[in-house]
Regions:
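Short N-terminal leader segment in a subset of presequences, especially plant chloroplast
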Residues: 10-11, 63
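Bacterial signal peptide processing site
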Residues: 22-24
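Bacterial N-terminal signal peptides that target proteins for export
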Residues: 1-9
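C-terminal motif of bacterial Sec signal peptides marking the signal peptidase cleavage site
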Residues: 17-20
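Exposed beta-sheet edge and beta->alpha loop/turn motif
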Residues: 89-135
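Short, aromatic-enriched amphipathic alpha-helices that serve as compact interaction elements
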Residues: 26-44
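Short solvent-exposed beta->alpha transition segments
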Residues: 45-94
Length: 135
């Protein structure tokens, strides 16, 4: 019985460790997922901007401008957002990913959105070059 418990504890510890490690930022998919986490889940535009170039960076800059003066911090009621990867098209220099997000508010309402994330390989690694949202 003690051996089984040790195995379960080790498996749980390993799972928690792997979850805490985050995404592999050396891959296009890892960068796309990190961007989605910061932009849509955590609503941290400054962090999301770190993973962008080109059109994506201009869009984030505009979102920052439009939301200036609106404090989003630990006290802000944020929706619960879960997402899944639906499709991916990966290449050596450019890749695209389609995610579906489920957004749930505290009042029990929910809706889904699809996020298309385009990435490209830059001299400093993979970056999000464009993103769009649809119903």
């Amino acid at each position: 019985m003690k051996i089984k418990l040790k195995i379960v504890v080790r498996a749980v510890a390993l799972a928690l460790f792997l979850t805490a490690c985050g995404h592999d930022l050396n891959t296009a998919q890892g960068v796309a997922e990190e961007f989605v986490d910061h932009h849509y889940v955590k609503i941290d535009l400054q962090k999301a901007k770190q993973f962008t170039v080109s059109v994506a960076q201009a869009k984030i800059d505009e979102e920052i401008r439009l939301t200036s003066g609106q404090t989003i911090d630990a006290s802000t009621q944020k929706p619960r957002v879960n997402y899944a990867l639906l499709e991916k098209n990966e290449g050596e220099q450019r890749s695209t990913y389609l995610f579906e997000g489920k957004i749930q508010s505290d009042d029990g309402t929910s809706f889904t959105r699809k996020w298309s994330i385009a990435t490209r390989k830059e001299s400093n690694g993979w970056r999000v070059s464009n993103f769009t949202e649809s119903e």
